[in-house]
Amino acid sequence: TLNAGEPSPGEGRVTPSALHPHVTTYAERPVRASGRRSGEEAGTASSGTPSGMQFVEPTASLEEEIVAALPLVTRAQALLAEIAEDVQNNLNPDLERLRGVVSEMVLSVIRNPDALLWLLRLKRTDQYSYDHSLDVAAHVMIFGRALGLGEDSITSLGMAGLLQDIGKLRLPARLLHKIGALSPREYEIFKTHVDFSLHILAACPHATPQMLEIIERHHERCDGSGYPAGLKGDDVGLMAEIAGVC
């Protein structure tokens, strides 16, 4: 998400596990079996809570998938920069190409969820906001994969992760670059970025209702402490909850 402060409240092969033995990668980490049939969408109880998580065996090695995922990261960074420029020039951003890249990223995450994360750890630039947006998108897509969500839902999560804070471009620069906690008044202004994001994206033909709902609710919290609507419990929704914790 675009950065702003908030108030305080293989022999011979060098692998991630070999470099960092204390780190368990997503592909290595066991999760609770859901008991669902292969390929079945993650079930939810009436409350919208996922019935469980599932282990999905990677179909590509980390090394193979890094090669495939690297150009996706580069393309996504370039497209995010173009979208930011469009927004700053009061133009409607073109989401079609971004959705194409996100769809490819979803397939990469399904093949091996670790490759994208490792690339984002290594590929750091001065454009923190774009890297951070990609990091959020990668985590929500991987979370969706672990829950057994379908490709369309994971794509919506990825698009929302990349764009959910695009409205911060409409906020005063002094607010975004302030060091330290925001004052109560500044925080009220800061929270308007959600409405700005929705206003910017609602005019885009490729902004799906599911993506917009995730963006609208990703700062909501189940205890009602979030914003902008102070939603509680099931009203937040599973997809927005995923976006809110990543």
Where are these regions (language model features)?
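Membrane-cytosol interface segments
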Residues: 1-93
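Histidine- and acidic-residue-rich, metal-dependent catalytic cores
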Residues: 66-246
